[in-house]
Swiss-Prot record:
Classification via SUPFAM superfamilies: N-terminal domain of the delta subunit of the F1F0-ATP synthase (SSF47928)
GO cellular component, one term: plasma membrane
Pfam families to which the protein is assigned, alphabetical: OSCP (PF00213)
Subunit structure: F-type ATPases have 2 components, F(1) - the catalytic core - and F(0) - the membrane proton channel. F(1) has five subunits: alpha(3), beta(3), gamma(1), delta(1), epsilon(1). F(0) has three main subunits: a(1), b(2) and c(10-14). The alpha and beta chains form an alternating ring which encloses part of the gamma chain. F(1) is attached to F(0) by a central stalk formed by the gamma and epsilon chains, while a peripheral stalk is formed by the delta and b chains.
Cell location: Cell membrane
UniProt keyword annotations, A-Z: ATP synthesis, Cell membrane, CF(1), Hydrogen ion transport, Ion transport, Membrane, Transport
Task performed by this protein: F(1)F(0) ATP synthase produces ATP from ADP in the presence of a proton or sodium gradient. F-type ATPases consist of two structural domains, F(1) containing the extramembraneous catalytic core and F(0) containing the membrane proton channel, linked together by a central stalk and a peripheral stalk. During catalysis, ATP synthesis in the catalytic domain of F(1) is coupled via a rotary mechanism of the central stalk subunits to proton translocation.
Family (UniProt): Belongs to the ATPase delta chain family.
Species whose genome carries this gene: Clostridium pasteurianum
Name used for this protein in its record: ATP synthase subunit delta
Membrane topology value: Peripheral membrane protein
One GO molecular-function entry: proton-transporting ATP synthase activity, rotational mechanism
Main localisation: membrane
Amino acid sequence: MYEYLDRRYAVALYNIASAENKVEEYIADLKQINDLIKNNEDLNQIISNPKISTTKKREIFTSIFEDKIDLKLFSFLIILIEKKRIDQLTGIILQIEKVDLDNHNQVVAEVKTVVPLNNSERTALIDKLQIKYNKSIILREVIDKSIIGGVYVRVGDDVIDGTIKNKIEEMKKLMFIKG
């Protein structure tokens, strides 16, 4: 829903981080801050409570983070608080990671199999995906016994589902249509 705005904030922060050569540091810090907000019930309630003033939220963030993270990143978080966007931090992090991948001409491919790919399968898959997307591939392998067999690949919004589970589902649909 807020993807467009999240991307605008992400691009702005990415440009600052890139100029400072701190992209990885900023992403890591943002993830830690986001985890802290999510896992600390008190902080989460303060952030999400519209009755708590922006000034109070800014004071709390200042007391927690001011001297612990880069000043420009801290300023970015304060802007998010003032613009009432701090609750969208997860989406902003996802977008900044996408911007970073785009700028490095990379794409993440999530691959699900029942058993781990061997080296030749992995290399062949990466080669085919690099040709298809004309980008360097970051392969994230997931073992998923529920797919029964075959391979499932997701790159962005593209899905290649060559799993036995999917074939069974397709057969079930055909049986219901004809039956």
